[in-house]
A protein has these predicted regions:
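Conserved mixed alpha/beta catalytic, RNA-binding, or beta-rich assembly cores of soluble enzyme
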Residues: 106-110, 114, 118-132, 149-272
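Conserved small/polar residues in nucleotide/adenosyl-binding loops
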Residues: 274-277
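Generic N-terminal targeting/processing segments that precede catalytic cores or assembly contacts
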Residues: 1-157, 161-163
Length: 277
């Protein structure tokens, strides 16, 4: 199975390429960055537009053998130079443009009002652009704007509307790598939703393995689905997360077949992981 690369890796690569072309005046058709996982990523650079104090370019997201909705989309970076600075160290300002979401609810990686560019991608962008600044002996200010032309439409197919991220997708990734058929991504989504519910003051986690339980909560009790979390088969991990985040109780609603497994101490309810004798 072939690895892919996250939107964070693509944003860092595009920002590095744009900064390089701006500060050197040379065209860069491919660029290499180091991902947090230690795997180098070499990306083709497209859509190059050069100006006197600004360069923009794009990198096409490659999701590998486990593509998500962002695979094939262009992750763009526009870097603008501003010579103001202390003359000793470069200053980098990172923001999101068209197609990158804005955070409107607490409990996420970024504070309310910020572009939904998570902290690891921000660190990656900073590290890669700082490398270019050192090579070019640049000590001014660079404004880095990350955008995704089709990001607003793509976001409707993600968890972002549910999480209160409006206007586009998030720039994500903790390792820089998209692992094929990774269950870790789903578990991280569960953690994000639980953390957000806790930040908004909830003390009881309303959880369901799937749509059956969510529909039951809504139709029978009129429960607000924005206050519930779908945990798939990862019930044990979800209970642990809720405890770590300080919830005092959990309401677990689902199909009787799933709940019988939990009653028997089976905390991952995937059908391939348990068979009766």
């Amino acid at each position: 199975m072939r690895y892919g690369f996250t939107t964070g890796s693509c944003a860092a690569a595009a920002a590095k390429a744009a900064a390089y072309m701006l500060l050197t005046g040379k065209i860069k058709n491919c660029i290499t960055i180091e991902t947090p996982k230690g795997i180098p990523y070499t990306a083709e650079v497209t859509d190059i537009v050069r100006g006197e104090s600004q360069v923009s370019c794009a990198v096409v997201k490659d999701g590998g053998d486990d593509p998500d909705v962002t695979s094939g989309s262009k992750i763009c970076a526009t870097v603008t130079a501003d010579n103001r600075g202390d003359g000793e160290k470069e200053l980098l300002q990172i923001d999101g443009g068209k197609g990158v979401g804005r955070v409107t609810r607490p409990g996420l990686d970024q504070p309310v009002g910020n572009a939904a560019i998570n902290h690891v991608p921000r660190e990656m962008i900073t590290r890669e652009v700082q490398e270019v600044c050192r090579i070019c002996d640049f000590h001014g200010t660079l404004h880095i704007l990350i955008s995704v032309p089709d990001g607003e439409a793509l976001a409707e197919r993600t968890f972002n509307p549910r999480l209160g991220i409006v206007g586009g997708i998030s720039i994500l990734g903790t390792t820089g790598i998209v692992e094929p058929m990774s269950s870790q991504a789903l578990k991280e989504t569960i953690r994000v939703e639980l953390r957000q519910q806790r930040a908004e003051g909830q003390t009881i986690a309303a959880v369901s393995p799937g749509n059956y339980g969510l529909d039951f909560m809504q139709q029978t009790y009129g429960y607000d689905l924005d206050r519930s979390v779908k945990c798939s088969n990862f019930i044990g991990e979800t209970i642990d997360m809720a405890a770590e985040l300080g919830f005092c109780a959990m309401l677990l609603t689902g199909h009787i077949g799933k709940l019988i497994k939990v009653a028997g101490g089976i905390m991952n309810t995937h059908c391939l992981l348990y068979t009766s004798d």
